[in-house]
Regions:
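Transmembrane-helix motifs of polytopic, lipid-linked glycan transferases
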Residues: 93-114, 153-156, 331-334
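Membrane-interface alpha helices of multi-pass inner-membrane proteins
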Residues: 172-193, 203-204, 225-230
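Hydrophobic, aromatic-rich transmembrane alpha-helices
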Residues: 206-207, 289-358
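Hydrophobic/aromatic-rich transmembrane helices and adjacent perimembrane loops
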Residues: 316-327, 354-427, 435-438
Length: 580
């Protein structure tokens, strides 16, 4: 009994972390088993890719319709399909598997930059989530979970390489770590360019701190493995275009990038809108603020919708939340920059083993803050932050790495616990900066844990509403299949989930808002639609297509033979050409 207790005590942090990861998995499995979140066309497209991989032996290199976003999520889902069959639940279980991998890798990074207790706190933050955060984790957009996985892997490997740079007994392992770094960088860039800040900054850190290892063969090894990770992209570029226009398979989905009409805003107005969209909408959404003061997307943006006292109060709260996080992030970067510069001088002058270990910790924390900070800056400069900051908040998913790192950084700079517990530092008094860091770490961790816990509970409370919407979609698919409407036209956000949920018995063509035809993300669907006469149209009930359908029917000389309303949500039109 004593031996068992000793074994448990010696591994208590690892056991607790495993329990936290298991709870994170269970919480997410519970959500997806209950049907939350429901599918959309991006999510369903990934499911179709996974089905084609598992059932047809296809090997897509990129997400259908996106020639810059890898297909790793589809392969993960195909693996789950092999055991559970093709379904929305199985698709999202593949995402949960990827997120669990991220949590494991992130723990490997956190224990290198802080204590195991604070690493556990960081894992607890990752286990929880507000509705928007969980939505981004459980929707198969492609590339976002991979950004977390490979970003955390790059940080963990770089931190270990810096820490072991002076240990001659680990030379072979360092070369293996460099190979792993190159492979993670290549696979990450293939999956999504959002990982680029992690690649660039960790590469710079390796060149700065690990030059004896990376020079010559180390660089060759890392670059070779990077190219290996990028090989799917290289193969795609080297492969001749298929007989059908490549655009049918890999062309980007047409999405608006700015207001359709109106006067052109000035440079100052544009910059202000970009910053406000990032600081008031995107950043709070990806850090849990939606729990404490919920808004709908239409209430949150644009600014014209800030008309009621409740909305104005929530926007004010979001301003405080976003501003506080930006200030704390800046504080963490300043503290770590100072720590890295000071400790590097000591290390170059023959510093102690402890100072070298402290250098690796501080460098790791700096990288874990700097890469998401670069992402925030680039996002703020993009049109997405001003035009649709709620939708594109997913671009800031690397904040899931920044938050635990920020807590570790603030806690590390508490007087005698500042980065580098040298004898000289242990005699320092707590300065104002250190007290600020201590208060920030404790208060921020408590607020975030409470907000994210409430967010997880609140997401479970939203299940009933989502299940009602899922039933409407099931009724629509059942109606189409039972009445033989297997070739239909619809709009983008309906098309692909209809195909997926009908097990490809219903194939659809996509119409733009001006009724022009949009090439499918998968060329075979265009061929199937072309073989059938256009007779069935399916649209959301209150949409531009439904509202203008009768006028379009007159213009195109159609006779509306049947109009069916499904659950007061969708309209199904069956038409025939008018007789000459």
């Amino acid at each position: 009994m004593t031996g068992s207790r000793r074994w448990i005590a010696s591994r208590r942090w690892g056991i607790l972390t495993a329990a936290v990861i298991a709870l994170a998995v269970v919480a997410r499995v519970g959500l997806v088993a209950a049907g939350w979140p429901g599918p959309d066309s991006d999510d369903a497209t990934m499911g179709l890719m996974a089905k084609h991989i598992a059932a047809l032996g296809e090997r897509p290199i990129f997400f259908y319709g996106q020639s810059y976003m890898g297909s790793l999520e589809a392969y993960a889902a195909a693996l789950v399909f092999a055991f559970l069959g093709a379904s929305e639940f199985a698709l999202k279980c593949g995402l949960i598997l990827l997120y669990a991998c991220f949590m494991v890798i992130m723990y490997g990074f956190l224990i290198q930059i802080t204590s195991r207790a604070w690493a556990l706190v960081g894992e607890a933050l990752l286990a929880l989530g507000a509705d928007e955060m969980l939505y981004h984790q459980l929707e198969a957009y492609g590339g976002y979970l991979e950004t977390l996985i490979f970003g955390a892997a790059l940080l963990a490997l770089t931190c270990w390489l810096v820490r072991t740079q002076w240990d001659a007994t680990l030379t072979r392992r360092r070369y293996l770590a460099l190979a792993g770094w190159g492979l993670a960088a290549g696979l990450g860039l293939w999956s999504d360019v959002l990982v680029a800040p992690f690649v660039v900054l960790t590469a710079g850190a390796l060149a700065l701190f690990c030059w004896p290892t990376v020079r010559r063969w180390g660089t060759v090894l890392a670059l070779s493995c990077l190219l290996l990770g990028l090989s799917p992209w290289i193969i795609y570029l080297a492969t001749p275009a298929p007989p059908a226009p490549r655009g049918l398979i890999q062309s980007g989905t047409v999405l608006p990038t700015g207001p359709a009409a109106g006067p052109e805003p000035s440079v100052i107005e544009t910059a202000a809108n970009q910053f406000l969209g990032m600081a008031l909408i995107s950043l709070p959404n990806d850090t849990g603020a939606t729990t404490l003061c919920p808004l709908t997307p239409s209430e949150a943006w644009p600014q014209d919708s800030w008309t009621t006292p409740r909305i104005q109060e929530c926007i004010g709260f979001r301003a405080v939340w976003g501003g506080a996080l930006l200030c704390l992030l800046a504080l963490g970067l300043i503290l770590e920059t100072r720590g890295v510069l000071r400790l590097r001088r000591h290390a170059r002058a023959g510093g102690s083993t402890q100072e070298r270990a402290d250098l690796a910790q501080s460098a790791g924390r700096f990288l874990g803050l700097a890469a998401p900070a670069v992402t925030i800056a680039l996002y703020t400069l993009s049109s997405a932050s001003a035009f649709a900051p709620w939708i594109y908040a997913r671009y800031l998913i690397s904040l899931s790495i920044a938050l635990p790192t920020l807590l570790a950084s603030l806690w590390a700079h508490m007087g005698s616990s500042a980065a580098g517990n040298t004898a000289q530092q242990s005699r320092w008094r707590l300065t104002g900066t250190h007290w600020l860091a201590r208060a920030g770490a404790l208060s921020l961790s408590a607020i975030l844990l409470v907000a994210l816990a409430l967010g997880t509970v609140g997401t479970y409370r939203a299940i009933d509403e989502q299940q009602a919407q899922n039933q409407v979609r099931a009724d629509l698919v059942a109606y189409l299949t039972q009445h033989g409407h297997t070739r239909v036209y619809t709009e983008f956000w309906t098309c692909y989930w209809v195909i997926f949920q009908s097990d490809e018995r219903v194939i659809c063509g996509v119409l733009n808002a001006d009724w022009s035809y949009r090439p499918s993300r998968y060329a075979a669907y265009d061929e199937a639609i072309a073989e059938a006469a256009p007779s069935t149209y399916v649209f959301p009930l209150h949409s531009i297509w439904t509202d203008t359908f009768e006028d379009v029917a007159v213009q195109r000389r159609w006779r509306i033979e049947q109009k069916t309303i499904i659950d007061q949500q969708y309209a199904v039109f069956v038409v025939a050409p008018l007789s000459p």
